[in-house]
């Protein structure tokens, strides 16, 4: 497969919103119209359907993992693998199928990290779990994991290109949480289980 086609395919895969599709399949409201307005697993969970949230999480993570893993499996150049990783993540943030209005990228970023290194993904996930357990703020948990991920990548990944990608994904994820950052600072952010 042509490298450019691989990158484009990764973007299109990233543009598929499992939060929207799963919610529709379960007869739930469009997650963009309720709660935080984010079509991610945490907001789908606010509907009360744990299975729907789990499927959203797995779908969004899998679409981040699959194209990167395939690019590595077919021994594409590291530079191409990096572009594939960025493309699938941008597809989730700015999906062509939903007028370029997507999610915040937490699960998809985790999928990319998993393809790079299971240990890296595990450390990022552990960071999220610890902060969420202590604070009940999924946004703060995501921001903490994003802030720590480049450091983990620096220690674990041998390819500088992959480290740069993790840094870029972390910056984009933090940027997508800018409204949450403002709410955290002024005390108006709703913890999980409370209305946004």
From Swiss-Prot:
Entry superkingdom: Bacteria
Location of the protein in the cell: Cell inner membrane
GO biological process: phospholipid biosynthetic process
Transmembrane spans: 3-23, 78-98, 112-132, 154-174
Membrane topology designation: Multi-pass membrane protein
Catalytic activity line of the entry: an acyl phosphate + sn-glycerol 3-phosphate = a 1-acyl-sn-glycero-3-phosphate + phosphate
The keyword Amino-acid biosynthesis belongs to this UniProt entry's keyword annotation: no
Entry GO CC: plasma membrane
Pathway: Lipid metabolism; phospholipid metabolism
Alphabetized UniProt keyword annotations: Cell inner membrane, Cell membrane, Lipid biosynthesis, Lipid metabolism, Membrane, Phospholipid biosynthesis, Phospholipid metabolism, Transferase, Transmembrane, Transmembrane helix
GO molecular function, one term: acyl-phosphate glycerol-3-phosphate acyltransferase activity
One matching Pfam family: G3P_acyltransf
Listed SMART domains: G3P_acyltransf
EC number(s) stated in the UniProt entry for this protein: 2.3.1.275
InterPro entries hit by this protein: G3P_acylTferase_PlsY (IPR003811)
Subunit structure: Probably interacts with PlsX.
PANTHER family, A to Z: GLYCEROL-3-PHOSPHATE ACYLTRANSFERASE-RELATED, INNER MEMBRANE PROTEIN YGIH
Similarity comment text for this entry: Belongs to the PlsY family.
Free-text function comment from the UniProt entry: Catalyzes the transfer of an acyl group from acyl-phosphate (acyl-PO(4)) to glycerol-3-phosphate (G3P) to form lysophosphatidic acid (LPA). This enzyme utilizes acyl-phosphate as fatty acyl donor, but not acyl-CoA or acyl-ACP.
Identification of the protein by name: Glycerol-3-phosphate acyltransferase
Species for this entry: Methylobacillus flagellatus (strain ATCC 51484 / DSM 6875 / VKM B-1610 / KT)
């Amino acid at each position: 497969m042509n490298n450019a086609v691989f990158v484009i395919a990764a973007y299109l895969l990233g543009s598929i919103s499992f939060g929207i599709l799963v919610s529709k399949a379960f007869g739930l409201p469009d997650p963009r119209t309720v709660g935080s307005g984010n079509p991610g697993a945490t907001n789908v969970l606010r509907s009360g359907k744990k299975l729907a949230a789990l499927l959203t999480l797995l779908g969004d993570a899998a679409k981040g993992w699959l194209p990167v893993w395939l690019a590595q499996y077919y021994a594409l150049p590291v530079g191409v693998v990096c572009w594939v990783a960025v493309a699938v993540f941008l597809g989730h943030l700015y999906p062509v199928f939903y007028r370029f209005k997507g999610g915040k990228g937490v699960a998809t970023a985790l999928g990319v990290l998993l393809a790079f290194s299971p240990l890296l993904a595990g450390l990022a996930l552990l960071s999220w779990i610890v902060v969420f357990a202590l604070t009940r703020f999924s946004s703060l948990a995501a921001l903490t994991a994003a802030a720590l991920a480049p450091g983990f990548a620096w220690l674990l990944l041998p390819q500088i290109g992959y480290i740069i990608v993790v840094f870029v994904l972390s910056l984009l994820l933090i940027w997508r949480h800018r409204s949450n950052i403002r709410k955290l600072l002024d005390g108006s952010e709703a913890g999980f289980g409370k209305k946004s």
